[in-house]
């Protein structure tokens, strides 16, 4: 008999400064343990942000996608963190996320219409950033919470859901 599929929340914490957008967590998202039946993913992400010492800098958080990863269901969140100064000065391990980077890695692998997508981690991050860009146009409260620098650096991105996996 098969076991139940674990639900694993992940958060991609990003911050913006005058230089650009940065992935505060470095090279990957932060993931929690499986969600207990008396909890839920959003709460687990808040606990993870507290454990990482960044909850007090949270400007906004939004669930952007989900995917299957082996025996797990990954629930993805983007967290926009506030930085009053240069991001690298606050989080030395932060990595820049630029439009050039997203262009350089190209589109996700193509799949047939009846197949599940198999996104790379960079595709998940790119989708999350484009989702934030979409919120700039559709959700005034979240757009305001992002702050002017994040909005400025997200502006060149276009929401690209339809056709993202097309050849």
Describe the function of each predicted region:
Residues 1, 45-47, 122-128:
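Polar low-complexity intrinsically disordered regions
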Residues 1-31, 56-61, 78-85:
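N-terminal strand-loop-strand
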Residues 10, 40, 44-48, 84, ...:
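Glutamate identity and glutamate-enriched acidic tracts
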């Amino acid at each position: 008999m098969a076991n139940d599929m674990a639900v694993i929340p992940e958060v991609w914490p990003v911050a913006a400064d005058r230089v650009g957008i940065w992935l505060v967590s470095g090279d990957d998202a932060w993931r929690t343990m499986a969600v207990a039946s008396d909890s839920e993913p959003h709460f687990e992400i808040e606990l993870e942000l507290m454990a990482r010492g960044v909850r007090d800098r949270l400007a906004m958080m939004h669930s952007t996608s989900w995917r299957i990863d082996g025996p797990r269901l990954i629930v993805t969140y983007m967290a926009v963190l506030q930085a009053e100064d240069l991001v690298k000065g606050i989080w030395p391990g932060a990595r820049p996320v630029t439009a050039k980077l997203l262009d350089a890695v190209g589109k996700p692998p193509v799949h047939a219409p009846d197949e599940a997508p198999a996104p790379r981690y960079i595709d998940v991050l790119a989708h999350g950033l484009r989702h934030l860009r979409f919120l700039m146009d559709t959700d005034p409260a979240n757009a305001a919470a992002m702050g002017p620098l994040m909005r400025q650096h997200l502006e060149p991105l276009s929401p690209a859901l339809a056709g993202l996996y097309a050849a």
